Design a protein with these regions (language model features):
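Generic detection of long, well-ordered alpha-helical segments
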Residues: 3, 17, 88, 205-212
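Charged, low-complexity, helix/coiled-coil-prone segments
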Residues: 1-5, 32-39, 125-133, 148-164
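Exposed alpha-helical structural elements
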Residues: 8, 12, 26, 37, ...
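Long, charge-rich alpha-helical interaction segments
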Residues: 314-321
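Helix-turn-helix/homeodomain-like alpha-helical modules used for DNA recognition
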Residues: 73-150
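Basic, Lys/Arg-rich alpha-helical nucleic-acid-recognition elements, primarily the DNA-binding modules
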Residues: 1-81
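Residues that form generic nucleotide/phosphate-binding pockets
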Residues: 12, 16, 30, 101, ...
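Hydrophobic protein-protein interaction segments
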Residues: 137-311
């Protein structure tokens, strides 16, 4: 089956290219791969990953659905598994992939993103420098078990990471209608992690103060968007607070070009699929979680006010106001 799908893709690429251009040469330039790496993919020894499929699809206007076949029962997944030895490089590649996804979605007014989150979504915190840095610091701490841990204040992000974070925020904020279901204990879980690192003497008092202030700023922005029901650039924002906890984070992205489903695994890693059946199942699951949740955008004024006041109190109490 894998070789059959690979053959369909190669045939589609050949049909899309002028006769004088060789497939191998074109793919080497397009994907920035060496000759042998390209030939392994052409022969079917190695599968094209979803990022490569996305690049090929965009460059040659090839429909991946057509390549796979609408009636094909095979579900394709890609795992963004970030390893210790190339942590920042792989993190950057993941940001580039999703930034490109948002860039493609924003040209379609009907585009939408739905998510059920058991931790703070990227789009909520990535614009806050210390919070974004802490998430990466925590992941590096967890992955690099064989190396000494530097204090948070001495942990520096590469400039490329900072730049790509900003680009991700820019594209995701100007993209599409958003529905977010947030587990009610998300912030408490994050704060407990921050407090743990403080007890390890890896965070100092100033770090705690900075993170606290950014969290309060984030809550103020979320409350404002919840009241208006508007996400950033005048897109609809449906915000739910769940009364139960989720086992992981699920998201569903949709526009006329494609559907994309993602499931968070092992904290930082993501399993993603463009397979329509998987996407629809994920969408249905996310929507089913609304049964356990309370809509607080443009409604539920009392519940919303109590929720945000309680979150601010938790932040101040845990982080030693």
């Amino acid at each position: 089956m894998k070789n059959e799908l690979n053959s369909k893709l190669i045939i589609s690429i050949k049909e899309a290219l002028p006769p004088q251009i060789k497939v191998a040469t074109y793919l080497m330039d397009l994907l920035s791969l060496g000759r042998e790496a390209v030939y392994r993919r052409i022969r079917g020894d190695v599968s094209f990953d979803l990022k490569e499929l996305s690049v090929i699809s965009k460059a040659l206007n090839i429909s991946i659905d057509d390549v796979l076949g609408k009636n094909d029962t095979t579900a394709l997944f890609s795992i963004d598994m970030i390893q210790e030895e190339s942590f920042f490089e792989q993190y950057c590649n993941s940001l580039i992939f999703y930034t490109d996804i948002f860039s493609r979605m924003k040209v379609h007014p009907s585009s939408q993103v739905q998510g059920a989150n058991n931790e703070l979504p990227f789009s909520f915190y990535l614009s806050h420098e210390k919070i974004a840095k802490f998430y990466l610091y925590k992941w590096v701490y967890q992955l690099q078990t064989s190396k000494p841990t530097v204090p948070f204040s001495e942990f520096y992000l590469p400039q490329r990471v900072i730049d790509l974070n900003k680009k991700y925020i820019s594209e995701s904020n100007s993209c599409c209608h958003t529905t977010s279901i947030l587990s009610q204990n998300v912030l408490s879980s994050f704060l407990n992690t921050v407090k743990y690192f403080y007890k390890l003497n890896l965070l100092n008092d100033q770090d705690i103060e900075d993170i606290k202030n950014e969290l309060l700023c984030m809550l103020e922005r979320l409350e404002s968007m919840s009241i208006s029901g508007v996400w950033m650039d005048d897109f609809e924002f449906n915000f739910y607070i769940s009364n139960i906890d989720f086992d992981t984070t699920y998201s569903y992205m949709q526009c006329p070009e494609f559907e994309l489903s993602t499931i968070r695994v092992f904290s930082i890693n993501v399993v993603r699929s463009f397979t329509p059946e998987i996407c629809q199942a994920n969408k249905k699951w996310i929507e089913s979680l609304k049964r356990y949740s309370t809509l607080i955008s443009k409604s539920g004024d009392l519940y919303r006010t109590e929720f945000f006041n309680n979150q601010r109190k938790i932040v101040r109490d845990v982080l030693l106001d």
